[in-house]
Amino acid sequence: MYKRQVLTYSAKECIIRDYNKEIKFITEHPQRNNLIRNLCIDLKGNTLVLFSLIKHGEFLHELIKEKAHVNRKTFFVFGGTDSETREKIRGIVEKERDAIVVASFGVFSTGINIRNLHNIIFASPYKSRIRNLQSIGRGLRTHESKAGAKLYDIADDFKNNNHTIKHFVKRIGIYNQEEFYYEIIKVNLK
């Protein structure tokens, strides 16, 4: 099952028109980041959180580590993480039952094979069909510990046909073409 979470903002927050300002706003929004953190903490099984901007990924990783149980393993992976370390993390997560990996789309959307992955969270907006399907593919690998995986695709609605909601609409089109079952849940951040 794929869950799409659409975050809505207050009228004052909905005046952003520039793409870069919009991305800066959502990646620095405390309630949005706390929602992602709390979702990670509440989910059972191994969870992959995918981000676009390194600064955002680092922040999410620290936020998650602060609240995660002391025995819950959390990892941060980005382009600067050497391949040996990536492989060690992959091996550890394959054996874990409740790890959290915060990773960049560029590194983890392709080429990393973790079959023991139960949840994927898209923490950053984008519209690429290939990246979308490759990222979902991380969770489709079979493993004896799961019947399937869940995707949490977080979108941001500024009520003005903003850039990130346009990207979300494109992703919904992909999900419809691929005949994925999904549910849209609105979350007010007011």
Kindly label every feature range from the protein language model.
Residues 7-9, 54-56, 107-109, 125-129, ...:
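Conserved nucleotide-binding/hydrolysis micro-motifs of P-loop NTPases
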Residues 150, 166-190:
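Long, hydrophobic alpha-helical segments
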